[in-house]
Amino acid sequence: MHQEFTMRPIARIHSDFSTKFGVPRQSGLVDSLEATVVFEPEFRNSDALRGLEGFSHIWLVWVFDQAVRKDWSPTVRPPRLGGNTRMGVFATRSPFRPNPIALSCVKLAGMEETADRGTVLRILGADLMDGTPILDIKPYIPYADSHPEALGGFAAVPAGETLEVVIPPELLEKVPENRREALRGVLAQDPRPHYQDDPERVYGFGFAGMEVKFSVKGKQLTVRDISSEI
């Protein structure tokens, strides 16, 4: 039986990431990352959020809108395996899927009433680009959603060690104080593709309206420049 379903975004995420580069590979890896969930006008009804304040964490169901493809492949190359080993798409969290749907667990830091955007959700630890469409929100329920005994397959442990981050004082001054911890956390996760390890190469990405450039040698990441994002 052939079926199709049409869905529309209920909200959009507003985060510090203007591009995919730099976005943490999973939610919760950088707890200090702040973002907001702003509902579409049709769904700005406070009754729909009644009771959500009692939960510390929520699930975001969202769309890989930057990775939509007409065709799909049954196997993909997970970056954490070096980009050479193929695994079944349903054994990975690759964005290149038959239905480009994603799931992120984030901390609900607060709910704020605004005059022009209705109730806005303040969240921590998100792994989404700015503007990402949200399809649904569900509460995280510890007794049902937490499984400490679960096996993690080829992703049983975090991907690699965190890096030592060096930001020269004159560059750190360019970063707003309320973004410094988050920036360090993002850089410590090593934003580079896993298969790239050129100590001479300078990488760059947009974060909180800034263009951050860095290089990595061994286990140390050094920020080379911070400027206003164009």
Go through each PLM region and give its residues.
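Conserved positions in beta-strands of structured domains
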Residues: 14, 106-109
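Mixed-charge, low-complexity intrinsically disordered regions
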Residues: 1-101, 113-230
